[in-house]
Amino acid sequence: MAELTLDVARKILDAALAKAVEKKIKPLVITVLDARGAVKVTAAQDGTSLMRAEIAHGKAYGALALGMGSRALFQRAQEQAYFVSAVNTLAQGRLVPVPGGVLIQDGGKLLGAVGVSGDTSDNDEICAIAGIEAAGLKANPG
């Protein structure tokens, strides 16, 4: 696949939402970015709390900006807080270095990232991975 299409982004979104329903977790916001960082799709389930859209976007944006899933970014923040703080300053505070931001890959090609927020970071990540894999792509959570 040369780039992440809107149709594929919708498949990722729909499958991630289906996983959330299956797991009976708290309402989620899911954002899918392409490799340029452009929003392909975003959706909020009914009942999401304030700031969830910004958090979901920040998880995907951080993963994409640094080329690592947000779980790895979280670990990097714990080990080298000064580095993540500096990068987040450059990114005008848009990085959210906690699990739930997952890179979308096809073979070795980076297509974009998914960010999920609303439940625990681990559950957010599970839904992101499910969406990506349902679209026949490789999920890289870090």
Tell what function each PLM region has:
Residues 1-142:
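Flexible, solvent-exposed loop/hinge segments and secondary-structure transition points
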